[in-house]
């Protein structure tokens, strides 16, 4: 659907403007997070018969909620599908002027992502997509990015997108009186209005770290998000949890939260899968009361890639000693499979490659 395409100059992200790429064959830039090639949910809908013919059983979608980046791991609104991949029914002019990087002037972007009619229409299109996926006997898993959100998020609103929009509360960046202030940790309590001293995940100011221990309301809100999308009318079949072990500020709280998340999701949809991104030993999360399983890096992706190509996924280093080395391959598989209980092993996401690593 070309009517929802991100426009060049629609808004600014990490110091430069959004770019609509017209040449499908263009190689993405190294920092190509603001480049958009026009894909959307309608495009997925149009390809469902093809995917079914390929024998696809499950479609795992990278984040689909409102976000300024093309990867969308910096969520702006957990309750709504991004109209840029959904449906835009209310639009306007208002691209940024040349040289302007102030997103409070990005009137077109603001209309597209804050107008409730666009958000409602996009959620409805997503509902239709899930219905069509299920009608073909396939499943769909959403990506849940709950460790951090984005600086554009309406709870933070560093870009002042929601500041003057009817129906939205003040973001925590905007005002010390924001209802979302406790959702984040601020280092300087005397910098409001427009307080930039919030904690970012790995110090990234575009990825504000969510402060679960300091906000019961935040915990309730994210549990509600977990329930919402696996429940009618959306009926998604599960969650893939981004950097799941990083959530919270302590290991004890992390386990506590995922136990509560599991209860919320399974009460809403007992068959929903809870699949975590995790590097290292996941045993303590796989005791039956937190995650169901994991993305299988250690006991599949890494050893298979070493054996067949000699490439180490994380560093892209070529390891001639591992290329075709059956002893190293079998040893790695056996060693890491011991960390997965039988149910988790059978249900693990076994990938040759994904968005976080070099392609196979």
How should these model regions be labeled?
Residues 1, 60-62, 141-145, 242-244, ...:
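A cross-family glycoside hydrolase active-site/sugar-binding cleft signature
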Residues 1-139, 147-149, 154, 201-204, ...:
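N-terminal structural segment of carbohydrate-active enzymes
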Residues 51, 61, 78, 133, ...:
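Conserved, mostly hydrophobic/aromatic
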Residues 56, 233-236:
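A structural motif
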Residues 130, 134-136, 147-148, 152-190, ...:
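Active-site-proximal helices and loops of the catalytic beta/alpha 8
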Residues 204-208, 242-247, 343-360:
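Active-site clefts of carbohydrate-active enzymes
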Residues 219-228, 232-233:
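Radical SAM [4Fe-4S] cluster-binding motif and immediate context
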